[in-house]
Structures are given as structure tokens and as C-alpha cells.
Design a protein with these regions (language model features):
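Conserved helicase motor
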Residues: 54-61, 134-136
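Loop/turn-to-beta-strand initiation segments
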Residues: 3-4, 74-78, 154
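Glycine-rich, flexible N-terminal cofactor/catalytic loop recognition
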Residues: 1-57
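A contiguous loop/helix-start segment that scaffolds small-molecule binding in enzyme catalytic cores
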Residues: 154, 158-240
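A charged, well-structured terminal subsegment
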Residues: 70, 140-156, 174, 225
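Class I SAM-dependent methyltransferase SAM-binding "motif I" and its flanking Rossmann-like core
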Residues: 94-151
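Glycine/small-residue-rich loop that forms an oxyanion/phosphate-binding "nest" at active or ligand-binding sites
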Residues: 56, 64-113
Length: 240
């Protein structure tokens, strides 16, 4: 049996690539990637001369069986995404599941992912959080947001610059305009920036300043009602 490695790649700065990731990509019998053109630039930068094969959301179900067979035959396969950690809003889950189901060793290297630095630098609680990634663009979007209306943990979303304002406005409708939010863009790149404030304030900012780059939006959870406050509300309700 071979080993399937899920290898994180930089989300911005090439210096975020780990030594172990470079070694695994050099030693692997096959490197799977979303886009051979994008990953080809990465491999060339680190002088990794290895074969690339496309493995993306449109072909992962069809190609996984053949990859599993190669792993069963003893090959070492490395999976990378265009940026970040495979499986986090990127292809990776299906192949990892199929490999594990067939008794193949699956190892994920620690490394770059966009939401962790955005969360930690947001100034919002990061001891407990829920990662939502990209919201559905149409079907189920409103239902999903409404299901998060009473979520008390910090929430994390990915968004493109073209939909940031619309998404923030939808957040304001569901969570209220005073909910705290941090919008982090261009993580680990030259123009990295975090805009923090209430939803109302951040919406106003991006209506005046055109959003650019990929965004991680970190939203505060709903404040828990203290037991003493809950008792007061109950007493008031029943005129105690």
C-alpha cells in the first residue's frame, strides 16, 4: 500500500511553503492538482520536477478510483490545491475518504490555510468557531444563513470581492447591523488588510472602497444571555 499526502501550499507568500511539503512533492510518484498551470508555477519555483495530473471538483469522482488503485499498488501520491489545504473549500475530501475506506494511509501536512490567520487576527473569540466556507450562491443560501441566526460561536466565511458587499448586507439582515465583523483580504500577500467594525460600518467602508482580492469574513457569534438576565426577562414576562 502506498500513502496519500494532502499537502498545503501557500495562500500568498511563497515563503510559507514548508520544507517537508517540498520534500514530499519531490518524492511523490504522482502530484495531483486543481490546475496544472497554477501548480506548475509553484513546482517550478521550488525546482520540483514531477508529473502533475488534474484532480478538481469536476473530475474527482471519476478519477478517484484509478488513483486509489495506484495507491494500492504502492505508489506515493500527493494532492495539492491552487492555494491552501486540500479539502478546505477545495477538492480533497472525496479522495481522502475513498483512500481511507480502502485501508490506505492518508496523511495531511500542517501548513497554510486562509481562515486560521484571519480568525486569529480578527480580535473575535477563536477558542470555539464554526467554519462555513463559501455560501451557496443561490439555492439554500437564505436558509443556511437563517439557521445561523442564533449561532453563538464565531463564524467564518469565504467570499469573492464581487459578492462581498451583498453578502455583508445579507449578514446584517440576519445578524443585525451592530454585529461585529472582520474582513480579511489578500492573506499573506503584499496588500493584506483587515477591516474591522460593526456590519454597518464595514458595509459602508466597502461601498466607498472597492473590494479587491479574496476575502475571509469572520463574524462574531450571538451573545449568550446571562442567567441573571434570562431570569429578569422571565420575571418580567410573568410579572413576578
Amino acid at each position: 500500500m502506498g500513502t496519500l499526502y494532502l499537502v498545503p501550499t501557500p495562500v500568498g507568500n511563497m515563503e510559507d511553503m514548508t520544507l517537508r511539503a517540498i520534500r514530499i512533492l519531490k518524492e511523490a510518484d504522482l502530484v495531483l492538482c486543481e490546475d496544472t498551470r497554477t501548480s506548475g508555477i509553484l513546482l517550478k519555483h521550488f525546482e520540483i520536477k514531477n508529473r502533475l495530473m488534474s484532480h478538481h471538483k469536476f473530475n474527482e469522482h471519476a478519477s478517484s478510483a484509478g488513483i486509489v488503485n495506484r495507491l494500492k499498488a504502492g505508489e506515493t501520491v500527493a494532492l495539492i490545491s491552487d492555494a491552501g489545504t486540500p479539502g478546505i473549500s477545495d477538492p480533497g475530501f472525496f479522495l481522502a475518504r475513498e483512500a481511507a475506506a480502502n485501508g490506505i494511509t492518508v496523511q495531511t501536512l500542517p501548513g497554510a490555510t486562509a481562515f486560521v490567520p484571519a480568525l486569529v487576527s480578527s480580535g473575535l473569540p477563536c477558542n470555539r468557531f464554526c467554519f462555513e466556507g463559501f455560501l451557496p450562491q443561490k439555492k439554500g443560501r437564505k436558509t443556511l444563513l437563517e439557521s445561523l441566526a442564533d449561532e453563538t460561536h464565531t463564524m467564518i466565511f469565504y467570499e469573492s470581492p464581487y459578492r462581498v458587499v451583498k453578502t455583508l448586507e445579507q449578514f446584517a439582515e440576519v445578524f443585525g447591523t451592530e454585529r461585529q465583523v472582520s474582513c480579511c483580504r489578500e492573506i499573506s500577500k503584499l496588500h493584506e488588510e483587515s477591516v474591522r467594525g460593526t456590519l454597518e460600518e464595514v458595509i459602508a467602508h466597502f461601498k466607498e472602497t472597492e473590494p479587491r482580492g479574496e476575502f475571509v469574513i469572520v463574524v462574531a457569534g450571538k451573545e449568550k444571555v446571562k442567567s441573571s438576565d434570562r431570569k429578569k426577562q422571565t420575571d418580567k414576562k410573568y410579572n413576578v
